[in-house]
Amino acid sequence: RAEIAAAVAHAIEAVDLQGREKTFISRLSGGQKKRVSIAMELLANPRLLILDEPTSGLSPDLDRSMMELCRRLSHQNCTVLMVTHNMSNINLCDKIAFLGVGGVLCYYGAPEKLNDYFDVEMTSDIFEKLRDPEQIELYREKYYTTPEFNRLLAACPEAAQEADKRCSQ
């Protein structure tokens, strides 16, 4: 029992919900419910955590805190795969991917190289570029010439060939 209580306390602390342990879920805000959901996942000590918009609806300070938690998890033998449209804390990510309309991979790599790669001043401008089919094709082809893609190609040639085949359809 003590081990379970300690694990629960650690998960609650990780998502900054101390003092809410006895609160009914129906009485929590949307952001708090989201954090409870993540805390429940943390109890399983996952090796892979897949999150869909985990920071939407959170205040800026909690958004940053949640992204820092994901970064800590990624450095503790847990791969964190996250879908987000919030660009304010992407500098906390080790790698990011940008997909064009239709799921076409246009970029995968370090967040600090994004703006140069897409030739934009503001990261949010990338979304507009990746709505245009011609721009998507341009960046898909550009990505295939990057050192990052070549490293992935060498490590997983079958996966890269399958991705290319799907994008060409």
Task: Give the residues covered by each predicted segment.
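Conserved ABC nucleotide-binding domain
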Residues: 2-5, 11-26
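Topological signature of polytopic alpha-helical transporters
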Residues: 3-7, 21, 95-169
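A short, proline-enriched helix->beta-strand linker immediately N-terminal to the Walker B motif
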Residues: 43-47
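Catalytic Walker B motif of ABC-type/P-loop ATPase nucleotide-binding domains
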Residues: 49-52
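Helical segment within the ABC ATPase nucleotide-binding domain
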Residues: 63-76
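Short loop immediately C-terminal to the Walker-B catalytic DE motif
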Residues: 55-56
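ABC transporter NBD signature
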Residues: 29
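Hydrophobic anchor residue at the start of the ABC signature
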Residues: 38-39
